[in-house]
């Protein structure tokens, strides 16, 4: 098992850990989903791209990102991107419709 060492408590977050692993063992698998394989480097790249896009839309530390998506690797990438920014990810059940969906969005008060 590859151990990570963080010099500073501020660096101890999943985004930093993935970046460090991408540097150290980049092509090793991070995620296997169905027939797809995602390496640490690929996940790091995707998470960074999503985080940059979310930041460009104004998502910052402590704000909420609501999303309603079917299960899959993309959900993981989006959640990790929110975490990388220090934002809170709010997954919404894809079965919610009408009042349930409206109430969930209203109560979660997402930035995006």
Predicted regions and their residues:
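Conserved AMP-binding/adenylate-forming core of the ANL superfamily
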Residues: 6-10, 27-80, 97-102, 106
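Hydrophobic alpha-helical segments typical of transmembrane helices
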Residues: 13, 17-18, 100
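Flexible acidic/glycine-rich loop/turn elements at helix↔coil and beta-strand↔loop transitions
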Residues: 20-26
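Structured binding elements
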Residues: 86
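Short beta->alpha connector loops at strand-helix junctions that form conserved
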Residues: 92-93
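Active-site charged/polar residues at nucleotide-handling catalytic sites that mediate phosphoryl
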Residues: 107-111
């Amino acid at each position: 098992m590859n151990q990570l060492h963080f010099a500073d408590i501020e660096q101890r977050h999943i985004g930093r850990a993935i970046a460090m692993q991408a540097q150290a063992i980049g092509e090793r698998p991070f995620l296997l989903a169905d027939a797809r394989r995602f390496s640490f480097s690929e996940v790091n790249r995707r998470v960074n791209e999503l985080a940059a896009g979310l930041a460009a839309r104004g998502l910052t530390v402590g704000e909420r990102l609501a999303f309603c998506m079917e299960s899959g690797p993309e959900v993981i990438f989006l959640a990790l991107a929110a975490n990388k920014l220090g934002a809170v990810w709010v997954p919404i059940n894809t079965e919610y419709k009408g009042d349930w969906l409206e109430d969930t969005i209203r109560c979660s008060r997402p930035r995006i």
